[in-house]
Swiss-Prot record:
InterPro entries in the record: Peptidase_M76_ATP23
Membrane topology annotation: Peripheral membrane protein
Cell location: Mitochondrion inner membrane
EC number: 3.4.24.-
Binding residue positions for a divalent metal cation: 118, 122
Keywords, in A-Z order: Hydrolase, Membrane, Metal-binding, Metalloprotease, Mitochondrion, Mitochondrion inner membrane, Protease
Designated gene of the protein: ATP23
An MF annotation (GO) of this entry: metal ion binding
Active site: 119
The UniProt record lists the keyword Mitochondrion: yes
Purpose of the protein: Has a dual role in the assembly of mitochondrial ATPase. Acts as a protease that removes N-terminal residues of mitochondrial ATPase CF(0) subunit 6 at the intermembrane space side. Also involved in the correct assembly of the membrane-embedded ATPase CF(0) particle, probably mediating association of subunit 6 with the subunit 9 ring.
Name recorded for this polypeptide: Mitochondrial inner membrane protease ATP23
Source organism of this protein record: Mycosarcoma maydis (Corn smut fungus)
Residue ranges, compositional bias (Basic and acidic residues): 7-21
Pfam families: Peptidase_M76
Length: 217
């Protein structure tokens, strides 16, 4: 996961982008129905993204130091991503996961809402189902759910990507986004055929699983 630039080393542009992302994030946690809903259901699983970090008094000093970072990390990123999910280590509670928000890749509050919601679905899956992220089928299932439920494949986002279409556009977008994510998994080794096959194998069951929603948002 990207590491935030120390504030005294930020360029003026990085400072502006970080502060804008921080403001939008605060506003979304107060006003976004989607973000508030996901926060509620993460909290029910003891994975509240806004809860205090663990301290050395509740863990070994080494472990606490290794994970001494906010649960919502705002930092500059490479051009290919807008956010990410960093799952907890196997030896840690699932609540010790974190979300990356790429301050230089978020172009609007709506984009941030979709990105944050996408990563919160991953966190929900990690807390609820104990996902093995090295298992391509597990990873594909969570990517399918996150792309489908978060708004990442909404009409406006697809139009902005210049993916024009109407028939099965949502499903096609979900598959495409899931395949791209699986390709980045070291267990896939960049094998597109393997990524596409894995997504196809789990698509129907995972696309139909809308938990914690009653239906697609």
């Amino acid at each position: 996961m990207a590491t935030p630039t120390p504030r005294h080393q930020e360029t003026p542009q990085e400072t502006t982008e970080r502060e804008r992302c921080e403001q939008w994030t605060d506003e979304l946690f107060r006003t976004s129905p989607m973000v508030r809903f996901m926060t509620k259901h993460l909290s029910l699983l003891d994975c509240n993204p806004l809860s205090p970090l663990r301290t050395a008094s509740s863990s070994s000093h080494a472990t606490a130091s290794a994970r001494a970072q906010p649960k919502l990390v705002i930092a500059p990123c490479p051009p290919s991503i807008a956010g990410g999910f960093s799952p907890s280590l196997r030896s840690e509670p699932t609540s010790e996961s974190s979300i990356l928000l790429c301050s230089n890749r978020i172009f609007s509050k709506a984009h941030l809402e979709d990105t944050l919601s996408h990563e919160m679905v991953h966190w929900f899956d990690h807390c609820r189902f104990l996902v093995d992220w090295s298992n391509l089928r597990h990873h594909a299932c969570s990517e399918i759910r996150a792309a489908s439920l978060s708004g990442d494949c909404g009409f406006v986002r697809e139009w902005q990507r210049r993916n024009y279409g109407f028939k099965l556009q949502h499903q096609n977008c979900v598959k495409r986004r899931a395949v791209l994510s699986i390709l980045a998994n070291p267990a896939c080794a960049g094998d597109r055929q393997k990524a596409e096959q894995t997504v196809d194998e789990v698509f129907q069951s995972c696309f139909g699983d809308t938990r914690p929603f009653d239906e697609i948002y």
